[in-house]
Amino acid sequence: MWFQLWGALAGAVAVPQAADTVWHELGVATFNVRYDNPADTLRWADRHREVAAAVAGFDLIGFQEVLPHQLDDLRADLPHLASFGTGREADGSGEASPVFWNPDRLDFLGGEVRWLAPDWNVPGTLGWTATLPRVATVCSFYDRHSGRMLRVISTHWCHESDEARRGSAGLIAGWTGWDEEAVAIVLGDLNAPAEAQEVQELMEFADLKDVYAVAKYRCRPAYGTFSTFLPAHLAAAPRIDHILVRGARVNWTCADEHIKWGVYISDHLPVHAILEISEK
């Protein structure tokens, strides 16, 4: 598909706009891959290669709901990418929200898994009224093409508690940092639509923009992301998977439909964006 080719080329092209500014494209994606549930319509063993292929051409990917053996599979299926992340339980097991990146483009400066809770540095801790631990994987990179620093966060918010999501918004807003020359990118399943108070607060507190709203081009006038495995449910799917950015322009965004044996390869659609970052 043409958008996959575009994603595969992202990061390799410098886009001249004005005589004094050079912009570099960076392909980013977020994908809730669905934890490995043997009762699912399409089992992980039958879809993990397609999951990896759906995002293989992008420079930065935030995954969600990745169990340890699923992380092993993604690393094996994406050998050209580097990765960082661990599970949400105290012992490192459970679902992870790892970050994958193109090491030929991005230098990894450091990363940390933080829990979405007031005691965010206590592994396995619960936040506010959440019934499960939730995490954010926070990574810093140097972009060799633009000379800019990137602050990247992959996260998966609570699906039950407004209070927990609002608390998570406050934490992540701070974790994006306040370096005016750095680019901040939040990738995640926030379990809330863009108009929800918690998402609006995250964008306001951290001066982030929703790529869906600000992209120069969007593949469809409107789309949802939490589709279930069944294509028939897409029309009513809420848009709860988001890419939020600060310090970059957005040329293009789309939620991609990948089908195997008549069903989607996850219960969420992967969302990608082509960002443009000015040269430092």
Locate the predicted segments by residue.
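Sec-dependent signal peptide recognition
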Residues: 1-8
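Metal-dependent phosphoester-hydrolase catalytic domains
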Residues: 163, 176-184, 192-280
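Solvent-exposed loop/turn segments at secondary-structure junctions
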Residues: 33-36, 67-70, 88-92, 105-106, ...
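Active-site beta-strand/loop signature of hydrolases that rely on acidic residues for catalysis
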Residues: 26-33, 51-74, 100, 139, ...
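Extracellular/periplasmic catalytic domains that process cell-envelope and extracellular macromolecules
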Residues: 20-24, 55, 76, 90-93, ...
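N-terminal, active-site-proximal structural segment of metallo-dependent hydrolase catalytic domains
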Residues: 9-77, 88-95, 277-280
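Acidic/histidine-rich helix-loop elements
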Residues: 30-49, 115-131, 158, 232-234
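Structured beta-strand-rich core segments of catalytic domains in phosphoester-bond hydrolases
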Residues: 60-149
